Amino acid sequence: MLDIISLGWGSLLAIFSFSIALVVWGRNGF
């Protein structure tokens, strides 16, 4: 149960940080 929750949070943080990176790169024009 804890493994599933931690895995869910890990993937959520990964997608969140990845989306932020895309926004930053988009504003900087790559």
UniProtKB/Swiss-Prot annotation:
Transmembrane segments: 4-24
GO CC annotations, alphabetized: chloroplast thylakoid membrane; cytochrome b6f complex
GO molecular function, one term: electron transporter, transferring electrons within cytochrome b6/f complex of photosystem II activity
Membrane topology: Single-pass membrane protein
Keyword Plastid: yes
Annotated keywords: Chloroplast, Electron transport, Membrane, Photosynthesis, Plastid, Thylakoid, Transmembrane, Transmembrane helix, Transport
Purpose of the protein: Component of the cytochrome b6-f complex, which mediates electron transfer between photosystem II (PSII) and photosystem I (PSI), cyclic electron flow around PSI, and state transitions.
Protein's recorded name: Cytochrome b6-f complex subunit 8
Organism: Gracilaria tenuistipitata var. liui (Red alga)
